[in-house]
Curated annotation (Swiss-Prot):
Residues that, per the record, bind iron-sulfur cluster: 39, 103, 105
Gene Ontology BP terms: iron-sulfur cluster assembly
Cofactor: iron-sulfur cluster
Keywords assigned by UniProt, alphabetized: Iron, Iron-sulfur, Metal-binding
Organism per entry: Buchnera aphidicola subsp. Cinara cedri (strain Cc)
Molecular function, one GO term: iron ion binding
Protein's name in the database: Iron-sulfur cluster insertion protein ErpA
């Protein structure tokens, strides 16, 4: 059910698969989390992890797994996870309908 409430683009899936290939470990999962900080109050974090914690929410799509803790998931529902490459660099980007403001770099937001 959650996979329909958080969209993962093809570009994000391809990048996650490349990261797993580089690490030579397809059992790793991409953890997405929200922490306090940044110029707008909250910021996104991304890490590859082996272990899913007891209360984590797991989203499996196209052979990759994304895990999100129960507190972060409430701020991400309805969002879209993408991966972009442009003149500024390359990065995962979250389009978040719950964010009232974002900073200029797009790395932090407020609710």
């Amino acid at each position: 059910m959650l996979k329909h409430q958080i969209k993962i683009t093809i570009n994000a899936i391809k990048k996650i698969k490349k990261l797993l290939l580089k690490k030579k470990n397809f059992k790793l999962k991409l953890r997405i989390f929200i922490t306090g900080g940044g110029c707008s109050g909250f910021q996104y974090g991304f890490e590859l992890e082996k272990i899913t914690k007891k209360n984590d929410i797991s989203i499996i799509q196209s052979g990759i797994e994304i895990i999100i803790d129960p507190i972060s998931i409430q701020y991400l529902l309805g969002g879209k996870i993408d991966y972009i490459e442009n003149l500024e660099g390359s990065k995962f980007v979250i389009s978040n309908p719950n964010a009232k403001r974002t900073c200029g770099c797009g790395l932090s937001f407020s609710i």
